[in-house]
Structures are given as C-alpha cells and as structure tokens.
Amino acid sequence: MNKQLAKQNEPATLQVIACGALARELMVLLDQLPDGAVSLTCLPAAWHNHPEKIVPGLKRKVVAARRKGMQIAVAYGDCGTGGTLDAFLEAEQIPRIAGPHCYEMFLGKVKFDAEMETALGTFFLTDYMVRHFERIVMKGMGIRQYPGLRDMYFGHYTRVLYIAQTDCKKLRAKARQAAIELGLDYEYRYTGYGDFHGFLSKLA
C-alpha cells in the first residue's frame, strides 16, 4: 500500500508513516482521534521481503511531508533494515514507536518476552498475516510449488501463535488452518491494538 490514507475534513499537521501491513489497524485508531489531527501514509507491506527498499522509501515520504510543513512520526519496526532505519530517524529527529517489530508492539514487551521464553520457536501471525497467509507464506515462500521447503523454513519452529487485533471467528479458523499447513501447534492470544493506541494518542 503506497497511498495516503487521511482524514479529509481538515488539513492534518502530523503525518504517520507506517508499514502497509498496519494500515487497517492504524486507521481504526485514527478514527478515534479528532478529525484531521493525524494523516497516515504507508509503504508497501511487501517490502518486508525487500528491506533494502524501506529506508529509501521512508526518506522520500519524509521529504514529501516536510514540503507540506508537517510533523512526522513513524510506525515501523526495524523490519530487517539492520539498524539503518533507526539511524536515519535519529539523524532526522523523527520519533518511532518503540519495539523491534510489530509482534512486540501488539503484545507489549513484557508479554512478548514471556511468550518467547515459553517457546523460542514461535511463528507469529497477526490479523494481516492471517488474511494474506496463502500469498505471503505458502506462495510467497514457494511452499505451494515446492512442499519440501516447509520443513526447511519451519522445521525449527514449534508453534504458531496468532496474536489477534480483532475478535473474528473466521480469522481464528484461518489461523488454525495455517498452523496445520505448517505442521505446527496452534495457540491464540487476543491483543487488540497493543502499544499503537498509546503511541497515536500521545502524538495527537
């Protein structure tokens, strides 16, 4: 997703630049803020598979926002950038939501650490990943075409943990099926929007 998603009633003074995989959740939260307070623009979620594109894409978004005189905040994890994302944001003095990835942002650091201590071999699914599991994992990682890749990629995992942003029976069923596809145990935690709610509320 590479288009601006914004409240239209009034010109926003703050723009959040985010991963497209978070767009649906962030828009729900933005709907709870005063109209026009914050606008949202996203980089493509598919760039998780091409992290070298993230920082250059972010730079372009920052330049565009500053030309409009907007303040900027970022809803991204490191996402495979090897620290270059944080180095850029620090140099530009742009705030980012705390956490290395969205799994910790949804669960919160304490709960995330506890889950990892319970089972280090955890493959996390969010609502977005459940919705797009076939495209991202089964086809995107080549498992549909080459089934032997499943154990190569997931042989060291022990469970799928679906951390849900919404209470949706259909998504729970899809997440359980995803675990079956991967040959892993299945567990479920409802997280809601985790740390993102507080992050956006403070910005507004």
Residue ranges of each PLM-predicted region?
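N-terminal basic/disordered segments at the start of proteins
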Residues: 2-33
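Gly/Ser/Thr-rich loops at beta-strand to alpha-helix junctions
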Residues: 17-24, 47-48, 75-85, 103-105, ...
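Short helix-loop-beta junction
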Residues: 31-40, 179-184
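A short beta-strand-loop structural module common to alpha/beta enzyme folds
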Residues: 36-54, 188-192
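Glycine-rich, highly charged phosphate/nucleotide-binding loops
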Residues: 51-64
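Long, charge-dense
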Residues: 83-136
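A conserved mid-domain beta-alpha-beta active-site/ligand-binding segment of alpha/beta enzyme cores
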Residues: 117-171
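C-terminal, charge/polar-rich interaction regions
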Residues: 164-204
